[in-house]
């Protein structure tokens, strides 16, 4: 994959979507109704399932975090659910879809690099991701039980509801931008037109329903939504988005793309590959070595857009030599790339996740077991040989 394609237009446009949906009242109305309908005890599993559906249908974990994820974090704050736990539920759902949906880049890139049919590779990835996801969903239910006896109300709860209702005109009509985006997703329209339509719908609703001028809409798109509501809690929930909030993440994306080529030229990857070949005395040691190799290389570069083609391209021929199907490599890279990414704070995905949800990577990682349990399952499968697909005889 060429480094010049590392930064994609839709990634830069996500925070424009967040800004316009804040100004239009779309996210505030989702927070308002979410606090009215959801209970603290059921909040975490419901959030996990919602983000799973959104990510699987939309084919983007980043888009899920920026839309449903942002709204859910606001609801969590209002219901008194710890923000790290809420972020963990959001990430579990968002990155499950990113690993097992045929729409995101991650499965498509890994399937292409490994030269395996996309759906075959996804089904094989479910061997590790599926159990890890189910355990995470059960964890959400069990952890949420400690809040099931709590009453909905209190000073913060009432402060959020009253402030949001005072600052915005609230109506189900404000959910129109969400409806537009969901319909286009279900129609399998390309990502960029879908986000443009969502941004445009949000801008129109902001002008018609909230009285925001076109000049202010453009300002929100560039520097984010900013309002002094008189409530510090509500300000922290709503004041976000805008192109400038993505600059640090875009910088990391560019740096990762630039960093990948020198690593190849300097022979760093060759040294790591030589290490794998040296310890690869059996199929099990080879499989474990590849897991370690990709995890280390991804952690160094911080971008699986770089690690997938570089590492995958260099080790894919090892698998036929050991009579293993290359879809094992696809699963290994998804688990140590897409799964690991949100927990690595200096990675592009990790930086974006922490910035968007407002919770540090180390804080939410324990509440998103799927991210690291899938790696644990992959290691177990590599060591025991369980769940390892053999190469088909020609």
Regions found by a protein language model. Give the residues of each.
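Membrane-interfacial loop-to-helix junctions in multi-pass transporters
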Residues: 2-8, 33-49, 77-86, 167-173, ...
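Alpha-helical transmembrane segments of multi-pass membrane proteins
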Residues: 41-54, 80-96, 285-298, 322-343, ...
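Juxtamembrane and boundary regions of transmembrane helices in multi-pass small-molecule transporters
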Residues: 99-102, 110-162, 350-394
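Core transmembrane alpha-helical segments of multi-pass membrane transporters/permeases
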Residues: 1-28, 41, 45, 217-268, ...
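Re-entrant/interfacial helical elements at transmembrane boundaries that shape
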Residues: 63-74, 91, 104-116, 304-318, ...
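Inter-helical loop and helix-membrane interface segments of multi-pass membrane transporters/permeases
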Residues: 28-42, 81-86, 144-169, 209-238, ...
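Hydrophobic alpha-helical transmembrane segments of multi-pass integral membrane proteins
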Residues: 9-17, 40-71, 256, 272, ...
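Flexible hinge motifs at transmembrane-helix junctions and intramembrane kinks/re-entrant loops
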Residues: 176-220, 387-389
């Amino acid at each position: 994959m060429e480094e010049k394609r590392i930064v994609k237009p839709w990634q830069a446009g996500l925070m424009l979507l967040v800004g316009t949906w804040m100004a239009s009242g779309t996210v505030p109305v989702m927070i308002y109704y979410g606090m009215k309908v959801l209970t603290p005890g059921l909040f975490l599993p419901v959030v996990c399932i919602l983000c799973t559906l959104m990510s699987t249908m939309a084919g983007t974990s980043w888009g899920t975090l920026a839309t449903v994820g942002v709204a859910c974090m606001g609801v969590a704050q209002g219901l008194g659910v710890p923000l790290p736990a809420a972020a963990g539920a959001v990430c579990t759902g968002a990155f499950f879809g990113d690993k097992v949906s045929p729409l995101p880049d991650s499965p498509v890139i890994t399937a292409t690099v490994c030269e395996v049919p996309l759906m075959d590779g996804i089904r094989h990835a479910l061997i590790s991701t599926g159990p890890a996801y189910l355990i995470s969903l059960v964890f959400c239910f069990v952890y949420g039980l400690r809040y099931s006896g709590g009453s909905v109300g209190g000073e913060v709860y009432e402060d959020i509801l009253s402030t949001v209702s005072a600052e915005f005109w609230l109506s189900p009509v404000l959910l129109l931008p969400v409806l537009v985006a969901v319909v286009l997703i279900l129609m399998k329209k390309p990502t960029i037109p879908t986000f443009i339509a969502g941004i445009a719908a949000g801008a129109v609703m902001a002008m018609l329903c909230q009285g925001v001028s076109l000049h202010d809409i453009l300002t929100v798109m560039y520097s984010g939504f900013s309002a002094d509501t008189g409530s510090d809690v509500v300000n922290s929930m709503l004041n976000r988005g805008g192109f400038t909030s993505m600059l640090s993440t875009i910088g990391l994306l560019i740096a990762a793309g630039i960093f990948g080529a020198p690593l190849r030229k300097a022979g760093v990857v060759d040294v790591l590959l030589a290490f794998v070949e040296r310890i690869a005395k059996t199929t099990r040691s080879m499989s474990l070595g590849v897991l370690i190799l990709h995890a280390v290389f991804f952690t160094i570069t911080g971008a699986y857009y770089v690690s997938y083609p570089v590492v995958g391209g260099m080790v894919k021929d090892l698998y036929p030599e050991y009579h293993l199907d290359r879809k094992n490599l696809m699963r290994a890279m998804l688990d140590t790339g897409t799964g690991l990414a949100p927990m690595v704070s200096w990675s592009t995905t990790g930086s974006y996740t922490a910035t968007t949800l407002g919770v540090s990577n180390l804080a939410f990682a324990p509440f998103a077991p799927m991210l690291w349990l899938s790696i644990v399952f992959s290691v177990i499968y590599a060591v025991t040989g369980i769940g390892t697909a053999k190469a088909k005889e020609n």
